[in-house]
Amino acid sequence: MDVVAFFTEILKFRSITPDDDGCLKFIAEFLGDFEARFIEKNGVKNLILSKRFGDGAHLAFAGHVDVVPPGEGWQSEPFTPLMKDGFIYARGAQDMKSGVAAFVCACRDAKNFNGRLTLILTSDEEGDALFGTLEALKILKERGELPQFAVVAEPTCTGVFGDTIKVGRRGSINGKILIRGVQGHVAYPEKCVNPVHQIAPLLSRIAGHDMDAGSEFFSPSKIVITDIRGGMEVCNVTPSELGIMFNVRNSDITSADDVKNYLQSVLEGLNFELSLKQSSKPFLTDKDSKIVRAMSKAVQKISGVAPQLNTKGGTSDARYLAEFGVKVVEFGVINDRIHAVDERAGVKEVERLYLVFKELIENFA
């Protein structure tokens, strides 16, 4: 079974997060000469596949088989792959069964590799992502089997296949500000403490504020306000409190404590509460590391495109690998239809992705 046929088969599994619908078992049977360990926790299924070829480097591939719900309006049944005009349409085609198919087949077919290959597969990435890759990594650490290097096959390319390798990701800090005032009649503003009036002159110092100037691989860590509300939707009563919700996609330059200290200085003198939660931490893999150099070389050889290295986008399971000290990069197909109606992946992209991963493995000395 070639990579396109295998890709088509795994697209048929209705693996809406966190249900793998039997997809992981199918993959384990496909790679029958790899040692398989199934891990299940809180209704989440994970699979670790491993094979030692020699005493060289330990390289891992990671991905998820779960997908988001398809929604309505598709031109075909979302879990019945449709091949049309050089594309395969199905939910999960780009995000990320194309990547899974490519590295599974590459691990099966690669020759002359002298290290250890591990595949980490989960059905919990599109949901809470608490009992998936993270749980598998805990077990690998307990067994002393953490990989040195890893590739997460998320769809990274934006315009043409081969244009982007992700070498890191920004972190995510969610925050809430509650400003307390004194409710009163609008005719007697001197008797009120109006939190709307208090925050108004300060908003320009919060909304869109860059916590840092950015760096070679990270854009500035910006405070983005997502919600402001207060009052009772009436015109004659001032509010007793006002709430603000915000997010900061932070680089490795700015920490949650930096955000806390800045906002406390801006809000000094007000009666306020501030809460922050770092839901994911930023990471950056050195551009001169072995995995970055090897991936860049493989991508350029197969695609003919010199890939750019960046950290744009949201979070992914690569953050967990980085937290465990694994040098990790991300590379996959074009991502223009992820989570969309009529999600699709180019047949030639999938074939070339397979060749990129095979090239990487065979030359990862």
UniProtKB/Swiss-Prot annotation:
Which reactions appear under catalytic activity for this entry?
Answer: N-succinyl-(2S,6S)-2,6-diaminopimelate + H2O = (2S,6S)-2,6-diaminopimelate + succinate
Protein's GO biological process: diaminopimelate biosynthetic process; L-arginine biosynthetic process; lysine biosynthetic process via diaminopimelate
The residues that cross the membrane are none
Top EC class for this record: hydrolase
Q: Where is the active site?
A: D66, E125 (proton acceptor)
Q: Which CDD domains match?
A: M20_DapE_proteobac
Q: Which InterPro entries match?
A: ArgE/DapE_CS, Bact_exopeptidase_dim_dom, DapE_proteobac, Peptidase_M20, Peptidase_M20_dimer, Peptidase_M20A
Cofactor(s) essential for the protein: Zn(2+); Co(2+)
* UniProt xrefs under Gene3D superfamilies: 1.10.150.900, 3.30.70.360, Zn peptidases (3.40.630.10)
Q: What is its EC number?
A: 3.5.1.18
Under Pfam families, the record lists:
M20_dimer, Peptidase_M20
What Gene Ontology terms describe what this protein does at the molecular function level? Answer: acetylornithine deacetylase activity; metal ion binding; succinyl-diaminopimelate desuccinylase activity
Q: Entry's PROSITE patterns?
A: ARGE_DAPE_CPG2_1, ARGE_DAPE_CPG2_2
Describe the subunit structure: Homodimer.
Protein task: Catalyzes the hydrolysis of N-succinyl-L,L-diaminopimelic acid (SDAP), forming succinate and LL-2,6-diaminopimelate (DAP), an intermediate involved in the bacterial biosynthesis of lysine and meso-diaminopimelic acid, an essential component of bacterial cell walls.
Against PANTHER family, the record matches this protein to: ACETYLORNITHINE DEACETYLASE, N-ACETYL-L-CITRULLINE DEACETYLASE
By sequence similarity, the record places it as follows: Belongs to the peptidase M20A family. DapE subfamily.
- The identity of this protein, by name, is Succinyl-diaminopimelate desuccinylase
Q: Which organism is it from?
A: Campylobacter curvus (strain 525.92)
Question: Lineage, please?
Answer: Bacteria, Pseudomonadati, Campylobacterota, Epsilonproteobacteria, Campylobacterales
